[in-house]
UniProtKB/Swiss-Prot annotation:
Belongs to the ATP:guanido phosphotransferase family. The gene is CKM. This is Creatine kinase M-type. InterPro entries: ATP-guanido_PTrfase, ATP-guanido_PTrfase_AS, ATP-guanido_PTrfase_cat, ATP-guanido_PTrfase_N, ATP-guanido_PTrfase_N_sf, Gln_synth/guanido_kin_cat_dom. The modification Phosphoserine is found at residues 164, 178, 199, 372. Keywords: ATP-binding, Cytoplasm, Kinase, Nucleotide-binding, Phosphoprotein, Transferase. It comes from Homo sapiens.
């Protein structure tokens, strides 16, 4: 890079104490870790593309936290961020991912045949099944930091790759900027499209700059395999369908994802991955598999049971409302998914969802009959 980050150099005219953010009222992982000492140490560092510690933490400074959800409070701007600012990221990663250590190795397993069961979740209770992940393309900076030209290059590369898919994956790309308001809203309501960038986390991190330039959605002809381009990550890959056949959803996810990865590799742009962090993504909460395997499941009785939260925790699952994070459950329908991302494989994480949801549906059926479920409460997984 011929010139340094002049904006950051200018900030160095002020003492660290004068630049250090006020985090006294914050409830996020970044605020727990970033002391004045650490800020002093990191503030004149930058990645090869010019991302600084102030860029890393901005979203967490502007969003003190959520009363119920401990937000992460920081983002990576490029692949090197996790290395250059490791003294900030490592404790956050450990905190967020159950004590994951800087020396730990992540494992990847995208062989769908290793998943046991998953094709027999009761569709009267499990209304839909979905598996998603994110991927970052090597050689480009990440959405909080990329330039317009980079973002457009990522879109061009992605569309070329996706348009070469055939068979069950044959599909079409729909750029956001050529969609009507109505088309866009319909896709959002169908859970096919990312929301417009109103989330303060997206806005403060810089991910929503130039919206909707170079953003879009690609999906196969029967809308069961989707790829979001240039939202929070370069790519978000999603496999979904109505009902409870998680086995089929996961098969399509693995096969489609590996086809896409192959095409990018051949084009000389593999995905960002390393042995320690697995797949490198914008938000530290998604490192590892980046995978969220979830179902919409109806639990009218179990959700009112005093041990509902404890059961979820023991099964290593988390719940969200029907519309995703920050929403309420409508008609006792919850979005239940794996809590882990880093340190265990894709197959292991989806297995936890399949086994855990199956058990919770059995509990729900017992409660419907007025029977006790005390003997079914699982041990901590």
């Amino acid at each position: 890079m011929p010139f340094g980050n002049t904006h950051n150099k200018f900030k160095l005219n002020y003492k660290p104490e004068e630049e250090y953010p006020d985090l006294s009222k914050h409830n996020n992982h970044m605020a727990k870790v970033l002391t004045l000492e650490l800020y002093k140490k990191l503030r004149d560092k930058e990645t090869p593309s010019g991302f600084t510690v102030d860029d890393v933490i901005q979203t967490g400074v502007d969003n003190p936290g959520h009363p119920f959800i401990m937000t992460v409070g920081c983002v990576a701007g490029d692949e090197e961020s996790y290395e250059v600012f490791k003294e900030l990221f490592d404790p956050i990663i450990s905190d967020r991912h159950g004590g994951y250590k800087p020396t730990d190795k992540h494992k990847t397993d995208l062989n769908h045949e290793n998943l046991k069961g998953g094709d027999d979740l009761d569709p009267n209770y499990v209304l839909s099944s979905r598996v998603r992940t994110g991927r970052s393309i090597k050689g480009y900076t990440l959405p909080p930091h990329c330039s317009r030209g980079e973002r457009r290059a990522v879109e061009k590369l992605s569309v070329e790759a996706l348009n070469s898919l055939t068979g069950e994956f044959k599909g079409k790309y729909y750029p956001l900027k050529s969609m009507t308001e109505k088309e866009q809203q319909q896709l959002i309501d169908d859970h096919f499209l990312f929301d417009k960038p109103v989330s303060p986390l997206l806005l403060a991190s810089g991910m929503a700059r130039d919206w909707p330039d170079a953003r879009g959605i690609w999906h196969n002809d029967n809308k069961s395999f989707l790829v979001w381009v240039n939202e929070e990550d370069h790519l978000r890959v999603i496999s979904m369908e109505k009902g409870g056949n998680m086995k089929e959803v996961f098969r399509r996810f693995c096969v489609g994802l590996q086809k896409i990865e192959e095409i990018f590799k051949k084009a000389g742009h593999p995905f960002m991955w390393n042995q320690h962090l697995g797949y490198v993504l914008t938000c530290p909460s998604n490192l590892g598999t980046g995978l969220r395997g979830g179902v919409h499941v109806k639990l009218a009785h179990l959700s009112k049971h005093p041990k509902f939260e404890e059961i979820l925790t023991r099964l290593r699952l988390q719940k969200r409302g029907t519309g995703g994070v920050d929403t309420a459950a409508v008609g006792s329908v919850f979005d239940v998914s794996n809590a882990d991302r880093l340190g265990s494989s894709e197959v292991e994480q989806v297995q936890l969802v399949v086994d855990g949801v199956k058990l919770m549906v059995e509990m729900e059926k017992k409660l419907e009959k007025g029977q006790s479920i005390d003997d079914m409460i699982p041990a901590q997984k």
